[in-house]
Amino acid sequence: MGTVQWRSGNFELKFDGLYSRIEIDEDQLQNWFNGLAFSTFSGNTNPYTTPGSSYTIVDGDVVAGTLANSNLQVDHVVSHYNEVKSLTAGGLNAKWSGDVWTLGSDLSFSQAKRDNTWQAVRFGSNPDTVSFDFRRSVTPTISTSSDTPEYGIAGQTEPQALRDKIAALALNASRAVDAGPFTSLEFGARVARREKENRRFLSNQSGYDQPISAYQDLIYPVTMPDLNVSTLTGGNMAEIARIGFGGFDPSTLDEQLLDHWNVKEDVREAFAKAVFSSQLFGTDVTGNVGVRLVNTKTTSDGFDSVGSTIQPSTGSKEYTDALPSATLNFLIDDQRILRFAVAKVIARPPLDELRTGRRLDDPSVTVGQLTGSGGNPQLDPFKATQVDVSYEWYFHTEALAALAVYRKEVDSSIGYRTDREVINGLDYLVSAPFNGGGGYINGVELTFQTPFYFIPHMENFGVYSNYSLVDSNLKEFSPEDNPLPLSGLARKTGTFDLWYSTGTFEARVGYKYHSPYTVVYGWNAARLARLQSEGTVDLSLNWQYSKQLGFRFQASNLTNEPLRAYTDNKPNRLANQDDGGYQVFGRRYQLEATYKF
């Protein structure tokens, strides 16, 4: 990251650039348990009723059990995952300031890349007994009567590439005026283009017909002392693949055309704003009133399939929104401010959800109801009108007590559901992102921070705290009989920090809490989960050695709080790995050094 700034008289020019690269390269050992809920393996359609089996039901769900003689299949997976993410960003900002006019421009560009490959070999086994306990109040456990792979083998390679870039140009101007309460007029325009594309490939390779003994010298058992799970299988994946099916062969990779898509978004906008300063009821008042016009056009290219027939497809959407806004700030005195704000806002749909490309049943083959799935290039943005009111009391240096309340009247939301559509004259049930109806989001937020100036010799110590409460009637579309609350809205969140600061040295220990909330944990927005409440403790130490050189040490999750997610809006239904599941991240430590030229 770097910044270059040049100034001459009233003109200022600044360039900043950023490049970052993160690589994840890890061996992954996994056991996949197939059919715990319902199995058809070896003709066994209900493993819970076999002789010797037992189970526990809570709220209609099987949450624990011992399955005997059920012949369930366990996949022993030896895998490797590599992911390289990079970000390149740059901006050129120019500003000229005169006595009356101020002119500015901003040219920016950024590009994010992600290349990831998951590669694996799989063995199988059919243990006589599988025992598990996934109840919400306990650490999940699962064990088998035998942990040894019994047969094999299959291989899988799944590369994926994602590209996301945006370029934008903004021009703005302001003019000082003396027209009653108005002090300045501001206006400007911005154009931007964003483009996102995805590519995915897949290879499945079958193993030779040979006994498990052919791999005995290449695999070994791995136990996880901190997790109550059955023994995992480790091994030399490349050598296992060579013996099992001749090695991983890149020529076997097939393009997954239905996961190949490209979405472009062009945004043109202009704004005008009047800034004012006056008095009302004997109180100084500042604020502004303005409007922003936004035109958005999206185009999407991809592929559709009807059965096994794949063909190119395109989609487009264009819409224009007028977004007025106004703010009022009542400067009650030197310590107290009352703020009001009202605005109409939009949030454009994620580009991933605007992808074209549908998987549709072939009516010449499918018997019964036709189904399909895919993206939706016709999505409208999330729209809302919001009102904010806050009261701030700055009762001492670096001390604040504040109360803020807000309400958002939502006109249109976005979520995944299954809708009935007529396609080529035929009735389909299509699962895709759709626009939903409106609702409200109400919230209140309390903030309190202060140094301990009122305690002798404790003025370098202080506290920061924040608590927010959210209420909303907005729901996701699934599960249909008990929809999840809108994604990202935690009813309760809180932060409490104790700090110490001398100017050159600062220490902070903090506690953060959130109540359960809905998340999209992975890359597929159709797969919703509910993240259980969490409370974490973090530590941060900062030492500014000189004007140029500084050091920072951070320790996160000192209490080793696990992550637990559940599905279907039922806390006892533990989510699978891709949707959060149960994960122990451990404590994380980070040491940084910064030098300013």
PLM segments and residue spans:
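Transmembrane beta-barrel wall of Gram-negative outer-membrane proteins
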Residues: 1-65, 85-92, 99, 324-326
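Short loop/turn motifs that connect adjacent beta-strands in outer-membrane beta-barrel proteins
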Residues: 9-10, 95, 100-104, 176-185, ...
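Flexible glycine-rich, low-complexity coil/linker segments exposed to the extracellular/periplasmic environment
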Residues: 44-72, 131-154, 201-259, 369-374, ...
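C-terminal beta-signal and adjacent terminal beta-strands/loops
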Residues: 514-520, 542-597
